Amino acid sequence: MSTDHFADFAPNKTPFTSLIASRDGQNFTYESLHDRVPHILTDIINAYFTAIQDYDGPNKDQAVAEGKQITSELSKLKHEMVTDKPLTPLEDDGLGDTHVWNDWLQKFFPGGTWYTTPFLTWETYMYRRIAMIFKRSEHWNSFDFFFAKKEATFKASKVAVAKLCKRVDELTNECLGDIENTTKLHVAFIELLQASLWGNQTDLSMFPDLDSAKIEEMQARISSGENNAKIVSNDSEKIWEIVSTLSGGRVDIVLDNSGFELLQDVLLAHWLVKVGYAKHVVFHPKRVPWYVSDVTNEDFHWLTDSMRNPHF
């Protein structure tokens, strides 16, 4: 593909339909490929190295040997990334979409390298290839190399979690006590929806080094509502128009980040069911560990189990 189709990224000036690559040394996409994403990959390698050392399951010798091979493949991936090698085809790992990825890369970006392939393509390719490396293993195919970071981030959110749960409980009881008051229902829904939106601030693929103080600061802004004026495109009212017509229906929520944002999604679902707008809420997690903090099925159950545990 000719590089004429690509555009150098400038904040608020991205040409419509142009592809954004990472060639320019002064933009976010370049910084992502040069610093942010290699840092994430290094964190994966370090977390996995610790997991190998701590492994005490069956067939330990085989698992450790396999772990060393996986570490080598992850290091190879990082080397290819930072030295701008071509994106190589994925190997079959049983997930069923390998051919889709390979056909896409061959059709649109044949011979494309990390710095010449579009930003969104190479970053999603990286997470998919990491998943392939683990899925093709025997002992580590279900290992979540991001779990420890997701767990620590949620535990660091305990103050905001307590405030959020208390607030949702208050909103729910207020609405149930005056269920015919559509204005009250409307205001409560918008508050919950926008709180769920701002939970995205704890996206660990964008902020891999968040400490507990920064997390508390960001989550305090969510609780205060001061962020809402910064929403660039706000269709909350259109969503309310749809939700307000439901009566015991089904609502689907496509999950993004685990931990605090997931809890907000669950509490929004709780409110929708309690006040009668939904009878069923279906959550859609990711199939594999993705973009550091995205929700997997295991993350969902870990959070709900943790919230039930009085000693958590």
Whereabouts are the PLM-identified features?
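Generic alpha-helical propensity signal that fires on short helical segments
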Residues: Y55, A269-W271, N297-H301
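Short, glycine/acidic-enriched capping/hinge loops at junctions between secondary-structure elements
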Residues: F49-I52, L263-V266, D294
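Acidic, Ser/Thr-rich peripheral helices and adjacent loops at domain boundaries
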Residues: T296-F312
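Histidine-anchored nucleotide/phosphate-binding helix
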Residues: E261-V282
